[in-house]
């Protein structure tokens, strides 16, 4: 049951409140909590110089205190409330001590879900989260609802909660970090798929899966859980559903949910045809799955006509198999979002011919064997870069040896060199794609910056 936001207003007033992290989502939160009368101290690992005067001056009129620099968490003592940044583990020494002192530990997203008056659609998974979230958002908007999007994408929503009405709809993309500590779940929960990911942060795969499960473990009767029938991990969640259960599948007929019929190419929802695969503007079977998940999610709120209109007109999300340009008969695609092997495999499967693949980046301690075993025959030339380039090469070398095949592998020092190598080996009709199978943090702040740099390099090729 939704809680009255006035409860929070009364609760937070005059409370000594720590906000850990001064990133994009927490800055509006600091302003918001300050206006509600909280006594704010902002914490960040960056120094005052690294944050810049613009950020510090942003809070000059609100009496916000700062604890900055390498040992910033040593001052996390004596607070009534602590808003943690999503990537901060709840079992970190500083948070454990704060909790022992009696502090209420929470996050911007947890409080939003708790007090949001509108119906919330939550989406999580290893791959396909952003596209599925955006599809649900577009379908609800097409139907005429005032719709908000947040979480990993869009804007921080807790600071806008007073503007959200009971008639609105809210769509949230939720990461394992955001879900790890929440004790509330959205009314509609979608789990697109699950595979090894973020094992540099999570202790093991079990912890990662359990974090994802939080999207539905606090649901109640009348709520909806939507899972991928074709993914072993998500399909095993069936017995844990607390409300209604819907499934989607590209491999078999599903009565209670959505499925793809290979014979006629149609997508069905509750055994009624919605559209044909070829009606969908963005190509690839991974996008068919994203659409099926979205159809299930909005099935009680959106007409078939609105679903079809979005399918025919939605052009995709930036950095997701985004066409950049064609030069000398070679097409270049930006798939920088592909920060896991499974995501890269999905990308490779979307092309009709083997591609020149640029991969590699930050090491999340996940295995690359699936990429090598399932992707080798879809790659014409493999160009590797970043911290994982040797690790990926070793994995592919084993498969090349076992299968007695030829697959040229080129090692590059950086993205610019990788693109230049791709241009050298590409011939008329080839496809070059940046689909790293890794996070970007060894060279770039995030996948968007990496993708934009790739586009800049490609657009400057002559």
UniProtKB/Swiss-Prot annotation:
The keyword Nucleotide-binding applies. Keywords: ATP-binding, Cell cycle, Cell division, Cell shape, Cell wall biogenesis/degradation, Cytoplasm, Ligase, Nucleotide-binding, Peptidoglycan synthesis. Its main location: cytoplasm. Coiled coil: none annotated. SUPFAM superfamilies: MurCD N-terminal domain, MurD-like peptide ligases, catalytic domain, MurD-like peptide ligases, peptide-binding domain. GO terms for cellular component: cytoplasm. InterPro entries: Mur-like_cat_sf, Mur_ligase_C, Mur_ligase_C_dom_sf, Mur_ligase_cen, MurD. One of its GO terms (molecular function) is ATP binding. It is found in: Cytoplasm. GO terms for biological process: cell division; cell wall organization; peptidoglycan biosynthetic process; regulation of cell shape. Pathway: Cell wall biogenesis; peptidoglycan biosynthesis. NCBIfam families: murD. Belongs to the MurCDEF family. This is UDP-N-acetylmuramoylalanine--D-glutamate ligase. It comes from Clostridium acetobutylicum (strain ATCC 824 / DSM 792 / JCM 1419 / IAM 19013 / LMG 5710 / NBRC 13948 / NRRL B-527 / VKM B-1787 / 2291 / W). The lineage of its organism: Bacteria, Bacillati, Bacillota, Clostridia, Eubacteriales.
């Amino acid at each position: 049951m939704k809680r009255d936001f006035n409860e929070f207003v009364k609760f937070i007033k005059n409370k000594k409140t720590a906000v850990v992290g001064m990133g994009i989502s927490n800055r509006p939160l600091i302003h918001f909590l300050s206006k509600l009368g909280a006594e704010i101290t902002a914490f960040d690992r960056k120094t005052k110089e690294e944050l810049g005067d613009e950020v510090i001056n942003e809070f000059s009129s609100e009496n916000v205190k700062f604890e900055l620099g390498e040992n910033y968490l040593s001052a996390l003592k004596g607070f009534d409330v602590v808003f943690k940044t999503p990537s901060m583990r709840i079992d970190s020494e500083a948070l454990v001590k704060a909790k022992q002192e009696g502090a209420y530990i929470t996050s911007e997203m947890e409080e939003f879900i708790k007090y949001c008056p509108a119906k919330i659609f939550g989406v999580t998974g290893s791959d396909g989260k952003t596209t599925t979230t955006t599809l649900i958002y577009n379908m609800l908007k097409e139907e005429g609802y005032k719709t908000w999007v947040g979480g990993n994408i869009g804007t921080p929503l807790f600071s806008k909660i007073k503007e959200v009405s009971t008639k609105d709809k809210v769509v949230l993309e939720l990461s394992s970090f955001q879900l790890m500590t929440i004790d509330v779940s959205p009314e509609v929960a979608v789990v697109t798929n699950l595979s090894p990911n973020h094992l540099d942060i999570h202790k093991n795969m079990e912890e990662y899966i359990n974090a994802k499960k939080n999207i539905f473990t606090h649901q109640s009767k009348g709520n909806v859980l939507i899972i991928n029938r074709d993914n072993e991990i998500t399909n095993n969640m069936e017995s844990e559903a607390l409300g209604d259960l819907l499934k989607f599948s590209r491999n078999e007929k599903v009565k209670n949910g959505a499925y793809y019929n290979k014979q006629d190419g149609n997508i069905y929802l509750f055994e009624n045809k919605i559209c044909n695969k070829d009606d969908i503007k963005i190509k690839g079977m991974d996008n068919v799955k994203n659409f099926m998940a979205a159809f299930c999610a909005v099935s009680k709120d959106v007409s078939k006509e609105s679903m079809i209109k979005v399918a025919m007109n939605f052009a995709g999300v930036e950095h997701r198999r985004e066409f950049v340009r064609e030069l000398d008969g070679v097409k270049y695609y930006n798939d920088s979002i592909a920060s896991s092997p499974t995501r890269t495999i999905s990308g490779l499967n979307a092309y009709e011919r083997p591609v020149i693949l640029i991969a590699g980046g930050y090491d999340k301690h996940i295995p690359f064997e699936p990429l090598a075993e399932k992707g080798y025959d879809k790659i014409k030339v493999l160009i590797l870069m970043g911290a994982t380039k040797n690790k990926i090469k070793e994995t592919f070398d084993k498969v090349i040896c076992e299968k007695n095949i030829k697959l040229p592998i080129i090692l590059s020092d950086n993205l610019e060199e990788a693109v230049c190598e791709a241009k050298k080996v590409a011939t008329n009709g080839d496809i070059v794609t940046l689909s790293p199978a890794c996070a970007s943090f060894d060279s770039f702040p995030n996948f968007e910056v990496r993708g934009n740099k790739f586009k800049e390099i490609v657009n400057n090729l002559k």
